[in-house]
């Protein structure tokens, strides 16, 4: 399992699967399983019984995890899906960089 190049809060585009082409923000990253949850992507319906917390019960929609290899980071400067590089600055801090335009990603 490789290192995940995306983290919570990143804007990504889905590159494969039924939701290919959709864009969204990462709600949660799960590094142990190499998966991410992206808002509005891979929405599934869950049937729940009535409980004290939810007396109505019924069907709820929520986002399910997708593999992190199925998303690409969107560069804020060039607005294109890009691979992620790493660079060490003069002061010793490591930053992620856009492979297309070379801009540092926050």
Curated annotation (Swiss-Prot):
InterPro entries: KOW, Rib_uL2_dom2, Ribosomal_uL24, Ribosomal_uL24_CS, Ribosomal_uL24_KOW, Translation_prot_SH3-like_sf. One of its GO terms (molecular function) is rRNA binding. It comes from the Bacteria. The keyword Cell membrane does not apply. Gene3D superfamilies: 2.30.30.30. PROSITE patterns: RIBOSOMAL_L24 (PS01108). Pfam families: KOW (PF00467), ribosomal_L24 (PF17136). GO terms for cellular component: ribonucleoprotein complex; ribosome. GO terms for biological process: translation. Keywords: Ribonucleoprotein, Ribosomal protein, RNA-binding, rRNA-binding. Belongs to the universal ribosomal protein uL24 family. One of two assembly initiator proteins, it binds directly to the 5'-end of the 23S rRNA, where it nucleates assembly of the 50S subunit. Part of the 50S ribosomal subunit. This is Large ribosomal subunit protein uL24. It comes from Desulforudis audaxviator (strain MP104C). The lineage of its organism: Bacteria, Bacillati, Bacillota, Clostridia, Thermoanaerobacterales. The gene is rplX.
